[in-house]
């Protein structure tokens, strides 16, 4: 193995009430892809922020290209040849793709004016390299979340970096977009670029990475080549224990029908009908753009419906806003927790109780003691890792933020809980905790809709599964009669009956 192009040795970083990094180490080698693994809260993101100068380090050493390094901020590290593609998009929807890629370093002519033809041409080359079928003159806001992620990757590629850090880069990508990204990673590897690949998708780690570094509780646990381990061994390194069963589904006797949707049409949804019983988990599967999220938002009131009927507990409802949906007993946990679900500048307590203030008030007065008790109960129940309920939620790991988002929905005491990609960007340990919580609500008789792009998750946790394609239901199965092949056939528009299956 070559000499490391980047070495982080025994890095330490503490925040009030928590030691985020405790002698964490990472080596990055030219022409190799290093997976950085660990549960949420293990210190992966903090280590990357120390590297790029967002946080100062308390102790430890960074060596880059054989020289000690201490970057003053992301721009400094970027100019030195280290780019980071963040899990959360750092783009401006109102600008074009090209303007986003070259923001702050626009290509100019000899007279100091922006050379638009040259800038668009360079941006188009980057998009073609990633197989993005859009002109760089397109406004970013017109792109899907997955396409926007590819623009973020194109932006990093434009720096011709020697080290590229990818934090959950495929989280919002389709299979086609993921394969295009992997092609680019292989190309960069051949060119001698060192890549840090942060992902919770173990299948991707074994497909694209050469080496693995594992952190746990801010500590360096170990480094090995991918060929020296397997999924079980890697999980045990990450969580410090064996995960006996990935999807701990429980059997519950279903009650009466709680939710009935008949001929629902609107906002990318066409003539959808289904029922949901008490104590049932209904999985919704399909490819990106199939209309799953749109269907949930129409039911919840976040998108308008054109026609159709929604019955909740034998009463017809017509939610015209999210507040209306909540008032009727429907809670929706968004796939975009930072865009739709949480206010990052507020505390854990404020976020959790935000939608339930009417239930925590008497008249116009909020009962703060009741609020504190309810929030503390959820922090304990959900095992949310936070120094206190007053901690700003933006400082928490992704998995703990997701737990707060789910608790926020449950604070409203809903009849129907809609979970849209509840484990996206969440490590295997936190996933298991979320699955156990879902089972707890199911056992208590709550009606749950689980929307997920991960077919094993839908198959493993659901009682019944609907598959969508182009806004329509193309398949319905009892989970015990379904498999990935049947779900995929329906997801691409092929009608598959359960009997034929």
Curated annotation (Swiss-Prot):
Keyword field: ATP-binding, Cell inner membrane, Cell membrane, Membrane, Nucleotide-binding, Repeat, Sugar transport, Translocase, Transport
Annotated ranges, domain ABC transporter: 6-242, 253-495
Topological type in the membrane: Peripheral membrane protein
Positions contributing to ATP binding: 38-45
GO CC terms: plasma membrane
Pfam (any one): ABC_tran
Superkingdom: Bacteria
Primary localization: membrane
Keyword Iron applies: no
Function: Part of the ABC transporter complex RbsABC involved in ribose import. Responsible for energy coupling to the transport system.
Family the UniProt entry places it in: Belongs to the ABC transporter superfamily. Ribose importer (TC 3.A.1.2.1) family.
NCBIfam families membership: PRK10762.1
Subunit structure: The complex is composed of an ATP-binding protein (RbsA), two transmembrane proteins (RbsC) and a solute-binding protein (RbsB).
Name of the protein in question: Ribose import ATP-binding protein RbsA
Native species: Vibrio vulnificus (strain YJ016)
Protein encoded by which gene: rbsA
């Amino acid at each position: 193995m070559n000499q490391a192009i980047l070495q982080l040795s025994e890095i330490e970083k503490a925040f009030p009430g928590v030691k985020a990094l405790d002698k964490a180490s990472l080596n990055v080698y030219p022409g190799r892809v290093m997976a950085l693994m660990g549960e949420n809260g293990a210190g992966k993101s903090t280590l990357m922020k120390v590297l790029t100068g967002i946080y100062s380090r308390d102790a430890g050493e960074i060596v880059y290209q054989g020289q000690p390094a201490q970057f003053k901020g992301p721009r400094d590290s970027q100019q030195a040849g280290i780019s980071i593609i963040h899990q959360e998009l750092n783009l401006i929807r109102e600008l074009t793709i090209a303007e986003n890629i070259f923001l702050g370093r626009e290509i100019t002519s000899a007279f100091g004016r922006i050379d638009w033809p040259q800038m668009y041409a360079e941006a188009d080359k980057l998009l073609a390299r990633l197989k993005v079928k859009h002109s760089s003159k397109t406004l970013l806001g017109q792109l899907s979340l997955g396409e926007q992620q590819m623009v973020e990757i194109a932006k990093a590629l434009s720096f011709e970096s020697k080290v590229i850090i990818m934090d959950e880069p495929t989280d919002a990508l389709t299979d086609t977009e993921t394969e295009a990204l992997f092609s680019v990673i292989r190309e960069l590897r051949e060119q001698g670029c060192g890549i840090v690949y942060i992902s919770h998708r173990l299948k991707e780690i074994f497909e694209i990475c050469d080496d693995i570094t594992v952190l746990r509780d801010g500590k360096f646990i170990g480094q090995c080549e991918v060929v020296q381990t397997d999924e079980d061994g890697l999980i045990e390194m990450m969580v410090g224990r064996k995960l006996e069963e990935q999807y701990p589904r429980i059997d519950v006797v279903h009650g009466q029908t709680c939710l009935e949707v008949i001929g629902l049409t609107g906002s990318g949804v066409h003539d959808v009908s289904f029922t949901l019983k008490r104590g049932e988990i209904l999985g919704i599967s399909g490819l990106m753009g199939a209309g799953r999220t749109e269907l949930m938002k129409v039911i919840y009131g976040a998108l308008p419906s054109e026609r159709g009927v929604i019955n909740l507990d034998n009463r017809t409802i017509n939610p015209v806003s999210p507040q209306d949906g909540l008032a009727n007993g429907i809670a929706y946990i968004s796939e975009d927790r930072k865009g739709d679900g949480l206010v990052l500048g507020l505390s854990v307590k404020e976020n959790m109780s935000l939608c339930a203030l009417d239930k925590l008030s008497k008249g116009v007065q909020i009962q703060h003691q009741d609020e504190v008790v309810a929030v503390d109960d959820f922090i304990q129940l959900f095992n949310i890792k936070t120094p206190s309920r007053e901690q700003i939620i933006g400082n928490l790991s992704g998995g703990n933020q997701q737990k707060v988002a789910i608790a926020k929905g449950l604070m409203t005491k809903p009849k129907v809980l809609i979970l849209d990609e509840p484990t996206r960007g969440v490590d295997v340990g936190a996933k298991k905790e979320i699955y156990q919580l879902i089972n707890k609500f199911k056992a208590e008789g709550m009606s749950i809709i689980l929307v997920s792009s991960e077919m094993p998750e839908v198959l493993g946790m659901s009682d019944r599964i609907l598959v969508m394609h182009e806004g329509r239901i193309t398949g319905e199965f009892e989970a015990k009669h379904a498999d990935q092949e049947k779900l995929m056939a329906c997801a691409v528009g092929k009608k598959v009956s359960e009997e034929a299956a």
